[in-house]
Structures are given as structure tokens and as C-alpha cells.
Amino acid sequence: MLMRQKGIIIKAVDYGESDKIITILNEHGAKVPLMARRAKKVKTGLQAQTQLFVYGLFIYNQWRGMGTLNSVDVISQHYKLQMDLYVSSYAALAAETIERSMDEGDIAPYNYQLLQFVLEKIESGTSAQLMSVVVMLKCMKRFGFTASFNRCAVSGNDTQADLIGYSFKFDGAISRQEASKDVHAVILSNKTLYLLDVLQKLPIDKMNSLNIHQEIIDEMSDIILMLYREYAGMFFKSQKLINQLKRLEQ
């Protein structure tokens, strides 16, 4: 059966010498794996059209199991995401988070909206690292956990100025008054905890101007990755490349 669906490529894996397996997130919020024959060959014209983040109309044959890609009518290549290794790596982290949050057969229209929002924000100049944090905050529940950043997990104190870190012992933010009860709590700036709470709760259509200091973004990114490792056992391939890039700069 010949299918036509708009979507965004969220995963691309080389298969053999000349083929690729791509996964698109279609406009209905479903993952669609497709075999792209000879996509690594320049002459087929599919090499550029099967890159990560390509948004287009995908035409493919679908019977049982994996479909076979025929062609792509590209709407946007998202070129700006490919121009900088850090930008493309954090965008890939966002895409990987969404892809891994979904099981086969899941339908999640919000994930499609989230991905489109994030890619557009990155292209318009918003920090790709910050956008990866937004995605990971929004996807937490799909990985089976949540995190509270606006009150002390020990005392219930919700005075934001008193919160100084995150406690894995008590599974939540911790205040300076209770800090002695967990000497291994991850110390965070008060602003980091405040912004994590805001971004976690704020609908994406209300996120207009997102100008946050890089040190705060780094803190948010680090604690979010720790939460995913601790609570969901998740290690992201995209993050490995980011770590390698950071080591090269040292």
C-alpha cells in the first residue's frame, strides 16, 4: 500500500553498505520505521533527504512490518541545526529523548508538536542545550518518573529562596535547613531550581523569549541527565558525543 505522510526524521541508522533505516515521527504522533534503499549512494538523491531533522512528505510502501521509502518531498532540511556540532548534538539529544519515550504503536500528537516547537526555536537562535532540557522535562512521565523542584522533599518548605539542591535520598529539592540530612545532595543554584520548575510546568505555546545564562543551562542539563540515569536507567548516545566534544575543548 502506498502511503504519504508528513513527518520529521528522529532517527537514522546505517544498514549495510548502502542502505539506511530511518524513523520518522509523523504528524499524528506515531513512529514510522522505514528502510531507505541505497540512501547512502549520492546518485539516488536520498542521501541528503534522509538526514536527521529533515521535515517533509514521506512517500513509502507499507505492508507488514517496516515500510520501504520511495521518495521524500522535503519541506525543511533544518540546515542551521547541521552547521554547528554542539547545536546538532543537543538537537539530536532532544530527538533521541522523544524517540525513546515511545513504544512501538504509541500515538503521541504532543510529541510531534514538542519536536516541531524545539526545532523551530533552535533555528531561530534559542540555545539547543536549553531546548534539550525542555524536552527532557516534558518527557519525564513517559519514562515513568517525575521530579519536584519547588518545595523541600523533607519538610515541605516551599519558600524558593531556601532551596539549595536536589536530594536523590529524598527524591526532590532540599532546603538549607534540611541539608544536613543528605550530605550527598546535588548543590544547585536557587535560580536553576526555580527555572526547572517553571519550564516543567509552562506549556510550550507560552514559551516565548527564553534567554537564560549559560551557567544555569549547564546546571539544568547536568541535573536532568542525572535524574534520567538514576530514575530511568537512561544513557543517551547523543550525550556521549557531547561529552567527547567537551573533552576535546579542555
Curated annotation (Swiss-Prot):
Name this polypeptide is given: DNA repair protein RecO
PANTHER family xrefs: DNA REPAIR PROTEIN RECO (PTHR33991:SF1)
UniProt keywords, alphabetically: DNA damage, DNA recombination, DNA repair
Gene that specifies this protein: recO
Alphabetical list of InterPro entries matching this protein: ARFGAP/RecO (IPR037278), DNA_rep/recomb_RecO_N (IPR022572), NA-bd_OB-fold (IPR012340), RecO (IPR003717), RecO_C (IPR042242)
Pfam families for the chain: RecO_C, RecO_N
DNA repair found in the keyword field: yes
Superkingdom of this protein's organism: Bacteria
Family: Belongs to the RecO family.
Physiological role: Involved in DNA repair and RecF pathway recombination.
SUPFAM superfamilies assigned to the protein according to its UniProt record, in alphabetical order: ArfGap/RecO-like zinc finger, Nucleic acid-binding proteins
Entry's Gene Ontology cellular component terms: bacterial nucleoid
UniProt keyword DNA damage, yes or no: yes
GO biological process, one term: double-strand break repair
